[in-house]
Amino acid sequence: MARQKGKMNNELSPNPLWTKDFTIITIGSVVSMLGSALSGFAMSLLVLDYTKSTFMFALYNVIYMLPNAVVPVLCGPFLDRFSRKRTIYTLDFISSALYLILSAILMLDLFSFPILAVGCFLLGTISSVYYVAYDSFYPLLITEGNYSKAYSIASTLETLAMIMIPISALVYNSVGIVPLFLFNTCTYFIAAVMETHIGAEEKYIEKQKQSSSEVSGGIRRFVSDFRKGMEYLYSEKGLLAIAIYFVFSSFAGGATGSLTLPYFKSTFHNGEYVYMMVWGMMAVGRGIGGFIHYKVRLPVQRKFVIALFVYITLSLLEGSYLYFPVWVMMIMCFCVGILGVTSYNIRISATQHYVPDERKGRFNGTFGTLNTLGTLCGQLIAGALAEFLPVRAIISSAMFINLLAAIFVIGFGAKHVKKIYNVQN
């Protein structure tokens, strides 16, 4: 009996999530996210104040996102063969240096939109490589059975970073953007130093080296890896359906992201603060949603149904909330926050658990590129249409397209998507 009881306790006791490496990557993420949230929103305000144009604001977003259309696919196969950890902390050191250079340019009064565009393009390039490396390395630091809990923490941290947005606006309106850039210089440097102390073994590198004899030469190896990555995506109908849907979701998100802040600034007095109130409730919703997912496991056999419900409801809420009074917008955005973190948690934990470690780089690279193409199309089309069409109508149309994609791509692909979503992870 004692032996059976001990065995039962072992089975019921989950693996510890908060290992040394997971703690380091989490703290490092918090530090860098805080800096990014501060400077990112301030840069958006700077572009709007400098250009006075919704289209130019959309163009700024496109310039930042453009590298994501190509770079993830190019770097994905290489990140399946080389150290993702080293890539992560190296890029954080580079980001720290770049923000220091941008600070110096602004202090020397050399600012111009072309310089800002070049800086945004470089930051976008770094970001596009970083997130493929991070998304592929992060699962290696999660102990078995803790994927859902770990990704609920990640989504909650992103939400907490949004708390810095009001501070960003206050600092920007008071003393300008330079102090925020200098703060970002420090946060990225601290995060990079912390990440150098992660000790996880990257065993997938040896696996890839052992299987690399079939292809020789850098270009031939890259072509072979990229082809295999695409073949893998097409061979997995569930992953393909998820990827296609999130292209449409990214399209709608790109349209919304490009038009919402300009809409609030042009519609309300001190519109950036009204924007923060409304979208701040979304952050609160994401925080509460993340806490719920950390404490409560979704029923395994209902995950697909929950995800489809979330996709449809998000489309309806985000497509209509701008037609209501501010207090109603806040309530609707609170709901969007809770549902958004649910969508993220189900998708990321399921796909990262499903895809083998040695294929994660290629899958995440391809998935990221497809999402970026959707976002870029949404930003460009929405920005151009906003010059002569009502902003709210454009956003509603984009969300209606997203709604149709949820029904026809995810709904009709239920048989294959369930195999990925309805799994304990």
Give the positions of each predicted feature.
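Pair of pore-lining "gating" transmembrane helices in MFS-fold secondary transporters
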Residues: 13-48, 121, 234-255, 334
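Intracellular juxtamembrane helix-capping segments at the cytosolic ends
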Residues: 43, 129-142, 342-355
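Juxtamembrane intracellular "pre-TM" segments in multi-pass secondary transporters
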Residues: 4-22, 201-243
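Hydrophobic alpha-helical transmembrane segments
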Residues: 113-118, 124, 149-208, 276, ...
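C-terminal transmembrane bundle of multi-pass solute transporters/carriers
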Residues: 70, 81, 85-87, 91, ...
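A single, central transmembrane helix in multi-pass transporters
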Residues: 30, 175-182, 221, 225-290
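Loop-to-transmembrane helix entry/capping segments in MFS-fold secondary transporters
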Residues: 54-55, 144-154, 272, 357-367
